Amino acid sequence: MARDADTLFRLTAGLIEDHLPGQSPWTTTEAIGANGFGADPLFEALIAERDGQPIGFVSFFRGYAGWRGKAMGIVHALYVLPEERRSGAARALMAGVARIAREREWIRIELFVEEGRPAISFYDRIGMRDLNHRHMRLEGEALERLALDSPGIV
């Protein structure tokens, strides 16, 4: 567990560096360990290795497709070391999530990807469809303000 949490931390740092050069990770090895390997895990992860060395990971969790009334998988992050890209590692990681989805009878896998990212063509190649949805986020002060807004009906 501790080794996997450390591996996921290092790979997450690489993912952050790809997206926001110079930015330090906002998480810690301890947080990854507690959130992924504790009594009530918030996510699962698969780690790809070559010759015993980690080269990438995918993290995912179970979600709910309300319109269909069934469970689904949500990929939170997919990352492969730059020198290992186009090696089949990303496809193997996503295939692993697909096998888990099939075993657990999840009806689909979803993920969010930033516009213009090179990964979009990879997702197209493995059969994912672009839904053209917006990804919205509420956090920080906006979350706090909304939480305090109570019309008294909930």
What role is predicted for each listed range?
Residues 80, 86-99, 125:
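Conserved acetyl-CoA-binding loop-helix of GNAT-fold acetyltransferases
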